């Protein structure tokens, strides 16, 4: 049986209204908008948060949002990005990656494909074979004619773009062409030398961007190894906000300190706000707190403050999780740990756990169509709803600081839960009655298969002992 002890906290300004999607969310989700704030524990943290976002800010705001699969697909991030850019101005699309070359699912905003042979590494790998950059993935090719291709489902809006391609630039780097829409920009040895010593190649381009392609070309005067970390689209001038989606499916908290190539890249991108939005892959399989979490958070905070001493570090919670017939009660302990670390390191804290219904709520989200059948990942409308809460939590916090300019803290007491595990018979009823298999068809990916069965890429990988997302037609996969 579940009991919630409600705790009383100080008066806060009224919650701002949500859009139509929020109004349509059923009461059974147990949403609690009292937690729609970014909590802070010192006056300094409040000042830094306000300075990062307020509309009179002279410089653009740069947001890094690290996380796992819920960030990689960009449903939540897209919702938050568009709403925040409507408030503060659009400084550009931000970073994109070629997920096709990394053999994984792409963002909802673009198709990313490749030609030729590419090797890849990802931040959830314990010993990645390539250096990792800020996006948590790296791809590399030594094949003449190999290509990275992007087709944007909605063109990147017309502007004076500064396009930066983060890639190695040394004696091993081959010549390559960049094709934006139908315009080709060659990067031969002379052109590449202009950017020698920098972690990127740069193009200024005016107009909308419908497609982008990088082609490796043959040249006797260049190398053969192209190592790629991501492409950044920002406006050449003006303020506004840029929101970088830096998700890697299956990544745990400690993945963020495995990004060896990130320091140089982060200095260029200069983050003002950094979300460390992990946890699911730390607690899901063991229902305990991982001993690596504290160390990873501390190292990440130290690193980002070395780049920007006033950076706002956002520590978040997981949502409620249900796995193999059991409620993952460690979500409560993870919430408490993130709040304690936020207080200890002068960060801000976003309590999505209590905001989204708290312990033992995810199955109701599934019943209402806001969570997938695996009771780990949300559906499209579930992630959209979460993105709306990110936006409104920012606006509510700014309003609170404006109305309480001398406030040194904004702390909302977390909910307390008493939970009794289901009986063995109840657990048995919740499990599938038999194993299920799927035979891979031509053109299918782990992502499309996981969506078909309401599962996840990571779950299918684990169930079948797959070390990568590479599959082939005729392969038999266990689905449950």
What are these model-predicted stretches?
Residues 1-4, 9, 17-66, 70-242, ...:
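N-terminal secretory targeting modules
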Residues 275-281, 302-335, 344, 351:
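Active-site segments of SGNH/GDSL-like serine hydrolases
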Residues 422-462, 467-479:
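Primarily a LysM-type cell-wall glycan-binding module
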Residues 135-143, 257-292:
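Oxyanion-hole/transition-state-stabilizing segment in secreted/luminal serine hydrolases
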Residues 62-66, 73, 92-97, 242-247, ...:
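Structural recognition of the beta-strand scaffold that forms the well-ordered cores
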Residues 238-242, 248-253, 280-291, 318-333:
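Serine-dependent acyl-ester chemistry module
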Residues 321-420, 427:
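Catalytic His-Asp segment of secreted/periplasmic serine-dependent ester chemistry enzymes
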Residues 39-54, 255-267, 295-303, 332-336:
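Alpha-helical scaffolding within the catalytic cores
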